[in-house]
Amino acid sequence: MFEPYVKIKKKRSVNEIYENENLEQQQHHLQQQQQQPATSDNCCCENGEPQNAPEVATATVAATSVAATSAAATVATGAAASSSSSGNCSRLQQLISTPPVLLRRSSLQQQQHQQQQHHPHTPAATATPPQQQQQQQAAPSVLQQHLGHLNYESGATAAAAATAAAAAATVATSRSGSATLAQHLATPSNILQAAFGSSNLQHILTRSAPSPSSSAISSNNCSSACAGNTHYNGGNSNSGSSSSNSNHHSNSIIASRLFGAASSSSSSSSSSASASSSSVAASSSSSSHHLHSHHSALTNSITNRINQSIRRHLNQQQHHHPLSASSSSASASPSASTSSSSSYQQSSVQQQHYNCAHPAQQQQHHHHHHSSSSSSSSSSSSSHHHHNSSSSSNSNNQQQPQQSPLCLVLLVKCPNSKEFCNAAANFCDKRLPVNECQASQTARVTSNLHASSSTMAVSRVPSPPLPEVNTPVAENWCYTQVKVVKFSYMWTINNFSFCREEMGEVLKSSTFSAGANDKLKWCLRVNPKGLDEESKDYLSLYLLLVSCNKSEVRAKFKFSILNAKREETKAMESQRAYRFVQGKDWGFKKFIRRDFLLDEANGLLPEDKLTIFCEVSVVADSVNISGQSNIVQFKVPECKLSEDLGNLFDNEKFSDVTLSVGGREFQAHKAILAARSDVFAAMFEHEMEERKLNRVAITDVDHEVLKEMLRFIYTGKAPNLEKMADDLLAAADKYALEKLKVMCEEALCVNLSVETAAETLILADLHSADQLKAQTIDFINTHATDVMETSGWQNMITTHSHLIAEAFRALATQQIPPIGPPRKRVKMS
């Protein structure tokens, strides 16, 4: 989709074109020599005044060189319509082949003044129109070189096109066009002359619109351009109407509408001019209606918005420069009185000269006043003001040649645009950034007509970005963490196929818990042939809470069977956390079918061993963590105190005490030893030998055990605890290292077995390891038959008999509820 747009660019300085003055003078003498009458037998022009033939030829060349746009053709036809022109073809071709040269405006005014003095009564004193036509060609050509729109033709093509165009223009001759142009030139526009003081706008409009692919360089297009000019000026020729309509579609729509609207709103000061103007307005109105029928209503809206925007900016510029406009009018008043005192014929010639020299101002003047209706008296009174502005503009250009005015280029590519931005109306909806909003750029550019270079474009405004998702933020917050203790237990039943198969028979596992300090004791219960008649073909499996220190416990459980590959199979999990009380069990009455379990093909009983794997998740107390959002959270680095003190122990820096054991010495620090152990603190505080000598002799601990104990004192870790748990327990108890003592108890409890149960119980009793002692007694009571057969048990009977009594006392006080239904008595008959 093409979009209409308006561009404002700065014209090159006029001084850059005034470089070849010698060539200019030679051209002037050549033009005067060519004014002599000459005849030819093969003349292609109509009979008439020969002095006007160069006007037609030159105007036709101008229209041909720019691909015959409507704006330039209108000016050329208006100049040609002042009389029924005819001339010499040879002289016409010489004028066409002459290269265009831009003349100074001051030289042009002097030539006009001299011609009016030497030939006051002959209208043939128009040697300047060919020069003005050459100026009209040269000035846009230089600007087109700056803008990149060159469209020159060869001399032969231009001559042939000029000949055909002259014939078509002669047929379409009408004096009403001259009167209409005189009316348009009579409307005041100081700001237009100040801003557009050159004749470039007309040719910029004609050269910028045609497509490069069009065949505008042919003689047929030249004829259609002339016919199009006649169509806009109210002529009667219809020979090129069809080609003119197509040419208007490919050229500037805005330029053609400006001329059509301006022709319908202008008026004249005399009665004859008013009558001709009304006829031209009627013809132009019908032509404009025929042209507008090819465009959509949206194109009209875009055109009106652009016209209103340009008028508003020109009015603002006129208010900004009231003093300069008034001074220009005052300086040009003598020339205005001279022009007003001349005859009507001389006034018409001057208006034609001004039309050729200032087409851009005429077009911009039409565009500025196309929507206003003025009376005949106002148009007549403004005619002098317009010529005064022209004279003042020329004088200003001579005095200040460095200041180049701006040239307004109107380009409309496609009238079928469906969307347009409010930039044409100078309105910004704040949906774009400042550097992207075209409406904001328009306001900045058009507020100063002397800006260096800017662009005002009408483009599509994108939709606003989606707003960011706002997440709610609370000032206070709370995080509740429910603590869940998870542990597992594996139970292996050897020779499972030999188990008693009576219904309701129960097999019970040993008790287990989540840890050494956990008061919750659990066990598994299995019914090999079901619990009742309903489940006699199944294996029933239950989780039993043996003892607890709470009223109830909530827990979830999961049962599975390990196959020969030690993989979990036939897993069943509780759907929720059940409430357990002491002596209460939960499980599955129909856990697995017996025939499926006993089938060797399934691999669930490798070597006739049933391995049950149980996972328990006990719900403990919940913990609430609360805080406030306004507190700044900093990322605190992890504490490396343990590593730092470990390095201090290894490098032995700043040590002040020596610990010797078995011929080995360890360097240590009194402060650290005293802070970690009460025994060392008492040793260094009192008047003891260790304090005086700064040396501690240890005889009942191995050096490896002492080194591990010292490492724990410095770092809080014991990497080799598993290897020396029993000896390290004794050292921790001696030097009051409670944490190390509990760590040793845990390691010994994990490795508790039938063979080591008696020795572990003796060690726990000797070093007051209460937790290890309780766990060992429970283990002995569970495996009493096996433990009694060991040598350690036999030795404990003789050396530590009180431990045997404690073990049996714990067995007696342990309350285990009856498991399973009571056995029925068998009646003896």
Swiss-Prot record:
Compositional bias per record (Low complexity), positions renumbered to this chain: 24-36, 122-140, 266-288, 323-353, 372-382, 389-400
Localization, UniProt: Nucleus
A GO molecular function term, named singly, is: ubiquitin-like ligase-substrate adaptor activity
Stretches for region Disordered:
24-47, 106-142, 266-296, 313-400
Is Transcription regulation among the key words of this record?
no
Annotated ranges, domain BTB: 655-722
Where does the record place Basic residues bias? 313-322
Q: Which GO terms describe its cellular component?
A: Cul3-RING ubiquitin ligase complex; cytoplasm; nucleoplasm; nucleus
Its annotated pathway reads: Protein modification; protein ubiquitination
Tissue distribution is: Expressed near the anterio-posterior compartment boundary of antenna, leg and wing disks.
| Xref: SUPFAM superfamilies | POZ domain (SSF54695), TRAF domain-like (SSF49599)
Query: Which conditions up-regulate this protein?
Result: By hh during segmentation.
Q: Where is the MATH domain?
A: 486-616
- Pfam families with a match to the protein in the record: BACK_BPM_SPOP, BTB, MATH_2
The alphabetical list of record keywords is: Developmental protein, Nucleus, Segmentation polarity protein, Ubl conjugation pathway
Known partners and oligomeric status: Interacts with ci and gft/CUL3.
Protein family (similarity comment): Belongs to the Tdpoz family.
Please give the function described in this protein's UniProt entry. Answer: Involved in segment polarity. In complex with gft/CUL3, promotes ubiquitination of ci and its subsequent degradation by the proteasome, which results in hh signaling attenuation. This regulation may be important during eye formation for proper packing of ommatidia into a hexagonal array.
- Could you give the domain comment from the record? The MATH domain interacts with ci. The BTB (POZ) domain interacts with gft/CUL3.
**Identification of the protein by name:** Protein roadkill
The organism is Drosophila melanogaster
